[in-house]
Amino acid sequence: MKAYKLLTTASIGALMLGMSTAAYSDNWRYAHEEYEGDVQDVFAQAFKGYVEDNSDHTVQVYRFGELGESDDIMEQTQNGILQFVNQSPGFTGSLIPSAQIFFIPYLMPTDMDTVLEFFDESKAINEMFPKLYAEHGLELLKMYPEGEMVVTADEPITSPEDFDNKKIRTMTNPLLAETYKAFGATPTPLPWGEVYGGLQTGIIDGQENPIFWIESGGLYEVSPNLTFTSHGWFTTAMMANQDFYEGLSEEDQQLVQDAADAAYDHTIEHIKGLSEESLEKIKAASDEVTVTRLNDEQIQAFKERAPQVEEKFIEMTGEQGQELLDQFKADLKAVQSESEG
């Protein structure tokens, strides 16, 4: 851990040295929360490629751990050390409480086409969220889904009772903790870098993540029982330091917007079929893995506990959260009506 901290400090020092000669130069810095080849990295590389193909600017991409944990890269973006950051609302929720809306269980549909249409058309996503991020010096460029959340644990989960006395790792997100309390578990916040070891040593009994992240992080090796609960999607957001963005020329602002749009389209194509592909890799790599998909009756037992989480969300966020939730539900209803029609 000490060596990791030293490496992180050295990395940040190198960034600061580069900035001392040309703040906000045409070498833009972009950090995200995942490993090489994971969804956020796919987005970042597509963004980088578009920018470099259509301008003289360059983009340096930093992956998980190179500049610290999620909280670190957000702080560096707000301070102007980084120009761009990709961070899940799971971590942003401590900064922007209303962003925790994605952690209300069973709010989102499970059908991918409906989810993608929602992200494209939602007023809450495309009009309300940018204003919330702007209050914290952040220019929200894109929100996008990465995949359905899957629970892994030391034994199969089929009911809320199976969560009794289970220590489930959560991000540093108050509403996610409330979700697992409602499900009957003991939420246990833990930095991502400590999750594998925590599962291996029994400090925690389980965790949740999209299946591709479970595969790439090797979590199935130490937490082999996978449960598809249908309770939510892992959502993330790509944003810029607002001072940096507003200081760009109109041409460069358009370049950034176009690059984000192109990266979004590329990433959405990438995630189609990714869950199935990742699950097949996991099954091929381990004979100990079990896969449980809850049926409608089992899902209903969890759904019945969701309203108390929604109430907590309103307690945490007040009138602003209520307005966002109302719009969120209206947007979802509109999209679902279109798909049914």
UniProtKB/Swiss-Prot annotation:
Extract the signal peptide range.
Answer: 1-25
Q: State the CDD domains in the record.
A: PBP2_TRAP_UehA_TeaA
* Principal place of residence: periplasm
- Look up the domain of life of the source: Bacteria
**Where's it found, cell-wise?**
Periplasm
**When this gene is knocked out, what is seen?**
Deletion abolishes accumulation of ectoine from the medium.
Q: Which residues bind L-ectoine?
A: 34, 169, 209, 213, 234
Q: Which InterPro entries match?
A: DctP_fam, TRAP_DctP_sf
Keywords on record: Periplasm, Signal, Transport
Q: Name one GO biological process term.
A: transmembrane transport
Q: Does the keyword Signal apply?
A: yes
Q: Which GO terms of the cellular component aspect does the record hold?
A: periplasmic space
User: PANTHER family under this entry?
Assistant: C4-DICARBOXYLATE-BINDING PROTEIN DCTB, PTHR33376
- Any further remarks? The ectoine/TeaA complex displays a closed conformation. Interaction with the transmembrane proteins induces opening of TeaA, which facilitates substrate release.
Query: Member of which family?
Result: Belongs to the bacterial solute-binding protein 7 family.
Q: What does the annotation say about its assembly with partners?
A: Monomer. The complex comprises the extracytoplasmic solute receptor protein TeaA, and the two transmembrane proteins TeaB and TeaC.
As for what it does, the entry says: Part of the tripartite ATP-independent periplasmic (TRAP) transport system TeaABC involved in the uptake of ectoine and hydroxyectoine in response to osmotic upshock. Probably functions as a recovery system for synthesized ectoine that leaks out of the cell. Binds ectoine with high affinity. Affinity for hydroxyectoine is approximately 20-fold lower.
Q: Please give the name of this protein.
A: Ectoine-binding periplasmic protein TeaA
